[in-house]
Amino acid sequence: LGWATKDKEFVVETDEVKLATDTVLYAQYKKNEKTTSYQKDVTVNEDWDVDPNDLDSYTLLDENVALEEPEAKIAWFKTKAVGENYLAIDDAAGRGLYKAMWNYYHDGKNVNKGIKFSINTGDGLGLFNVYTCFTEDHPELSWMRGCGVDMAAGSNGRTYCYMHPSYDYNASEVIRNFNTVENSDRYQNLLKKVKKGKTTADTLDNIARVICANLAYTEDKDKKGNYSSKYRDAAYVINQSEKHECVCVGYAYTFKMMCNYFGIDCVNVGGDAEGGHEWNYVKVGKKYYGVDLTWMDSGSKQQNVYCYLEDAKTFGVKGYDKSNLRKSDLYIEKYITLATTPYKRNVTVGKFKYQITGGGECTLTGATAKGKKVTNLTINKGVIYNGLTYSISKIGDKAFKNNTYLKKINITAVKKIKTFTVGKNAFEGCKNIRTITLNNSFGKKINFCNKSFRLGNKKKCRVSIISSKKLKKDTVKKLKKAGLKKFTTN
């Protein structure tokens, strides 16, 4: 509706409010206001006439447009000028427009105002592609959605263009969102919860954990099928929604903004995943890994890290996997180096060492100095690292070889994993083990690699197998093959 003082003495019905006094103005809007469109549509009007006396104000586009440095006085706008989607623009005029848009709009400048530019007549310019690339790279400019472009040919061999916001959505929503960006401390409070880790991956863990603990997934349409764009708008999700409710776009945009805040390259990708979807690729080392935080929303009893720091094949990128689970509209995959395997890292949790292997799983690789003196080893629940839970799907090769402190082993093949594996020589030489419990009640197979249970025990150990008769028989056979000689079963 416009702007008003706190006691609503007067309302300014305009979206162009200039600072004149110390009076604080508050955005006024209708309750349950609906948005008719969120699409980043670009409409072109070629019946427009350019003012011949105003030609000098139109920036001539080419790839050499100089970029301004970001000021980033407000945390919300702390991002880099050129994002990864810029690489998907293959024409000089398009790259020039991208840079000109950054110069005009960065740090929250010129909210809801149009930009003037010109191109040499005959030069190609993919307006929709440029606008989409720019808005995907800069979700902090949340008020930028659809736009209209007025075009007119000049007598000097140039085509003059005026690109302005589209009003298919409610203009007061733009005012409201920008006002909350400048005055809300909710984003800053979320950032304070994110600790910068020792490594890039540790920082990403903390970002993902904070986002998924505070954002909640919701549907973006009502029972009548009417869509509301607010759940796709980062400014609304963070600064206005009490429960931080959003759809996939909200997760992807917030993740990118926080990554950029900590200096981590991240791209959000819009496309298809059996329906419209949005996800991220984030750079760790020299490669980009797939992240889909929608799977980890705070409504889940346990955060699912299946789609976190994954390889391109898992994400169904065309050329790696025929299923095409996620297909990008802009095919940014052609321009950045995607990882073909999940991101793996070695971590220590408590008394044991693990390798996170992808798909929400990890391998128990060994013990710390204190862990080597543990007498009872139980593997059932997951491992929590940086607030994210990973299922143990394997005991690594030689993980406990020649450990004479171990007396009891209890392994449960949890429901989440397909197969549990005990690696080569994992317990070889653990001659003092007296009790082994293998819980296979979910019907998951437990595989034993060569010499994994070659204990070298002089006394018989007792093996308790919790499973179906068929699996129990199979497990006993595999244990013998794995080197276990002296044992009795329940």
Language model: regions and residue ranges:
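Low-complexity, Gly/Ser/Thr/Pro-rich intrinsically disordered linker/tail segments
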Residues: 300-345
